[in-house]
Amino acid sequence: MKLSRYKKKILILGAAGMLGHQLYIFLKSKNYLVKGICRKNKIISKNFFKNNNLLNLDLEKFDLLENTINKYRPDYIINCAGIIKQKAHQYDKNKIYLINSCLPNYLSFLSKKFKFKFIHISTDCVYDGKKGNYKEDNITNSKDEYGLSKALGEVYSDNCITLRTSIIGHELNQSNGLLEWFLKQKKVYGFKKAFFSGLTTLELSKVIEKLLNKDLNKGIYNIASKKISKYELLVLINQIYDKNISILSSKKLQIDRSLNGKLFEKKTNIKISSWKKMIVDMNKYELLVN
């Protein structure tokens, strides 16, 4: 018998991160049974982490993770955990590959043992950004440790799906991402030749929730919006968030890591919102939950 969404048990790894906490909030609002795993004790006091639904666990300890999965027996595990590009230089190379590469492959193995579906979040940074409009079958060619480690972590066996994308969104206690950094500035440069096709964390959460009720069981898929320059994106955020930040155009950085998301849309019939709608929705949602 197919489980209704009200009874599906979801375990989110990296629940305190930019995507993880947004996904946790959104899935809880849709009445899924959600637990999160993170390492940050101070996050546990957040209002939306209630009723012991947040577990404090070091994801480097695979044996403890396996015991947790065995105890909770989730229907889905969604891996939002990872050492991010902005912080990769702070970590030993072995740890980067342990978390970004070994962990998702181990979870893929465990999905067979414990009979859960596994959704892993990858990145457009598996590509060098010289071409743009990358399709799923384009060979990954990143030159840095972050991109290489994420490419090695992409899984696609039975009941394992990798979603390759890029995100912007609000964070809990940090400002590692573009959005939180930008909102604290008075004057910035916006790169007119730096393109990407990411999603807001709220939009990606909506996509993942829809995917939980689709018959898509394996593979690597690009999740992509319409390509936009970093300059255009900052201008849009500036307007919608009613800021008065001075944005100076620059052509100094030239890179195009945009993804082609047509295959995912064809397979699932899930359509990605426009950038304007995504930013408006993100702003409204952040005001609502806070």
Positions of PLM-derived features:
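C-terminal amphipathic/interface module of NAD(P)-dependent oxidoreductases
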Residues: 243-248, 252-290
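NAD(P)-dependent short-chain dehydrogenase/reductase
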Residues: 143, 155-203, 209-210
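N-terminal Rossmann NAD(P)H-binding glycine-rich loop of SDR-like oxidoreductase domains
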Residues: 2, 7-30
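N-terminal Rossmann-fold cofactor-binding loop
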Residues: 36-45, 58-59, 82
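NAD(P)H-binding glycine-rich loop region in Rossmannoid oxidoreductase-like domains
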Residues: 57-99
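Catalytic helix-loop patch of NAD(P)-dependent Rossmann-fold dehydrogenases
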Residues: 98, 102-103, 125-163, 168-170
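Mid/C-terminal beta-alpha module of Rossmann-like enzyme folds, strongest
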Residues: 207-210, 214-262
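Rossmann-fold scaffold of SDR-type NAD(P)-dependent oxidoreductases
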Residues: 13, 74-80, 120, 222
